[in-house]
A protein has these predicted regions:
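Two-component system phosphorelay core
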Residues: 1-51, 55-115
Length: 115
């Protein structure tokens, strides 16, 4: 099993800075990410893909989801140049990466609520 692509140092800093609001930040990230994934799957428009990928990239980067941010950057930068099949694969890769890292944030949320 591979280790999810999450920068734990970023989470440590966020936990320290956000203190009691950290669980809410995690909830917001998880909920917003689900909405962004839904939007990515629902659209075939390159401009909408780029906009959604840009937004998702920013939040993923802020939350330390390194590989997720890289995949979103790829989609944002290349949405107009890739074939529909390649775009669908990239969206699937983003979805898969989020599925891989989501448990890290769920665990963080659980840990924050118990301490």
């Amino acid at each position: 099993m591979t280790v999810p692509n999450v920068d734990r140092d970023v989470l440590d800093i966020l936990r320290e800075v956000m203190e009691g609001d950290y669980p809410e930040l995690l909830d917001t990230f998880l909920n917003d990410s689900e909405e962004r994934l839904s939007n990515l799957r629902a659209t075939k428009d390159a401009d909408q893909l780029m906009s959604c990928a840009h937004s998702f990239k920013g939040s993923a980067c802020n939350m330390g989801a390194v590989r997720l941010a890289e995949l979103c950057q790829d989609l944002e930068s290349n949405a107009k140049d890739k074939s529909p099949e390649a775009l669908a694969q990239l969206v699937a890769d983003i979805h898969s990466e989020f599925a891989d890292v989501r448990p890290v944030y769920e665990d963080e949320k659980h840990h924050a609520h118990t301490h």
